[in-house]
C-alpha cells in the first residue's frame, strides 16, 4: 500500500486540469448539463446556488475571478470593457447561437480549439485568462 498522495496524485491532476467554468444565469440548464456530461468541464452554475441567482453581473464577474473560473454567458453586457476589464478576469466567453442544439455544437468546437489544442491529452484549464472571446455559430468551422 502506497502513500495516499502517491495514489491520489494522478486523480488530482486530472481534476485540476479540467476546465473550470462559471456559468451565469443566462446559460440554459441543458447547456450546463452538456458541459458537465459530454465535455467533462467543472461547472459552477449560478442557478444552483440560491445566493447567486439574482446577483448582479458585476458580482458574477468578481466571483468568477476570485474562484479562478472562466465566465461563460450569453449576456453581451459583459463585452463592456469599462465595466468588465478583460485583464482582471480568469477569462470570459460570450456565446451566441439561435438555439440550445447549436450552442452545444459551438461549445464542442470551443472545447476542441481552446481547452484541447493540438489534441493535447490534458486540457488547458483556463486558456482565456485576461481575455474575452465572443463567439457565434460560425466560429471554429473549417
Feature roles, as predicted:
Residues 65-83:
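Acidic, metal-binding active-site segment of PIN/NYN-like and related structure-specific nucleases
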Residues 16-18, 68:
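A general structural motif
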Residues 55-69:
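Acidic, metal-associated active-site segment
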Residues 2-15, 24-25, 29-40, 50, ...:
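Acidic, PIN/NYN-like endoribonuclease modules and their adjacent C-terminal/linker elements
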Residues 20-22:
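Conserved acidic segment of CheY-like receiver
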Residues 47-53:
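Short beta->alpha junction loops
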Amino acid at each position: 500500500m502506497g502513500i495516499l498522495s502517491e495514489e491520489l496524485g494522478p486523480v488530482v491532476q486530472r481534476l485540476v486540469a479540467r476546465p473550470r467554468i462559471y456559468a451565469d444565469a443566462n446559460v440554459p440548464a441543458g447547456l450546463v448539463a452538456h458541459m458537465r456530461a459530454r465535455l467533462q468541464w467543472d461547472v459552477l452554475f449560478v442557478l444552483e446556488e440560491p445566493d447567486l441567482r439574482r446577483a448582479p453581473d458585476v458580482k458574477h464577474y468578481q466571483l468568477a475571478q476570485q474562484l479562478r473560473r472562466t465566465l461563460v454567458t450569453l449576456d453581451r453586457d459583459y463585452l463592456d470593457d469599462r465595466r468588465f476589464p478583460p485583464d482582471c478576469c480568469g477569462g470570459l466567453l460570450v456565446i451566441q447561437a439561435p438555439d440550445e442544439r447549436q450552442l452545444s455544437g459551438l461549445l464542442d468546437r470551443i472545447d476542441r480549439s481552446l481547452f484541447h489544442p493540438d489534441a493535447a491529452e490534458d486540457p488547458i484549464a483556463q486558456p482565456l485568462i485576461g481575455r474575452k472571446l465572443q463567439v457565434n455559430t460560425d466560429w471554429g468551422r473549417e
